[in-house]
Amino acid sequence: MDKTWAEVTCEIPAAMIDLLADFLVELSGNGVSIDNLELDTFSLDTMDEAPVKTVRAYFTPDDELEEKLAALNRFIQEHAPAYGDAAPAPPTVTTLREEDWATGWRQHFAPTRIGRKLVIKPTWEPFSPEPGDLVIELDPGMAFGTGTHPTTRLCLEALEKLGTAGDVLDVGTGSGILAMAAVKLGAQRVVGTDIDPDAVAVARENCAMNGVTAELVTTPLADIPGQFSVVLANILAEDLVRMAADLTAKVAPGGFLILSGILVERESYVIDGFVSTGLTLAETTREGEWSCLLYQAGQ
């Protein structure tokens, strides 16, 4: 007989996500999922896009479930008003078969073509590449980013246009998708760094699955030796500005710096933050509300 799960869905103020997620993990003994929270972007500003978020947790449907649901409802009613929701809706419960829970989300992912050559493909999807296609396989169930968000697409398109015959540094590598693309586009050496060791572990698994070699480390940016033909950073706008000097220092003479993860409304803030670096703003590309800045260093 198939095992079943109780999927508990809560509609809460976005600012309450961390508080509720911690409570749900403790209450259920399992992880949680958050709907409509982009995994490929790193801007805290996006929290304002949807003031209400959907958080889902998964419980074993045992004799204690009703008691746990009552405790959850009390927790939401007690804390939500402090986050601006005076009358939060009670959580809802749906029964799922284990197979549905484990694989149902896969229907939302399909092979995605980016630029002229790059294709991001879920591991389970059949795909017949065209001549010249550079295919990157990802399992979004384990990855920190799937490559489908505009910030990542803008980075990948800029990287493809530049070509990567030299060395590439990927700052905030996440799932490693940009690092893998750089290798497949012909980079001689690729270094990916991330402050999160879990992200680095995932990136290493993804690189191994795709048969590519990249140096993936948790080394702070300032401590990474050498300079690079291309430096990529798809991170918080505030962090881009804070790290402007260190990012610039890693760009080789004549090299390029690609900055993404920037909301269009924050574009001028980032540009102003790089005025003193001596880099030249060579190109600005946008997709929807997102912006990507391409800088070049002097010779």
From Swiss-Prot:
Q: What keywords sit in the KW lines?
A: Cytoplasm, Methyltransferase, S-adenosyl-L-methionine, Transferase
Protein's name according to its UniProt entry: Ribosomal protein L11 methyltransferase
Give its localization: Cytoplasm
Q: Which reaction is the catalytic activity of this chain?
A: L-lysyl-[protein] + 3 S-adenosyl-L-methionine = N(6),N(6),N(6)-trimethyl-L-lysyl-[protein] + 3 S-adenosyl-L-homocysteine + 3 H(+)
Signal as UniProt keyword: no
Q: State the source organism's domain of life.
A: Bacteria
Amino acids binding S-adenosyl-L-methionine? 152, 172, 194, 234
Gene name of the record: prmA
PANTHER family named in the record: ELECTRON TRANSFER FLAVOPROTEIN BETA SUBUNIT LYSINE METHYLTRANSFERASE (PTHR43648:SF1)
Please give the organism. Answer: Geobacter metallireducens (strain ATCC 53774 / DSM 7210 / GS-15)
Q: Name one Pfam family in it.
A: PrmA
Q: Name one GO molecular function term.
A: protein-lysine N-methyltransferase activity
Gene Ontology biological process terms in this record: methylation
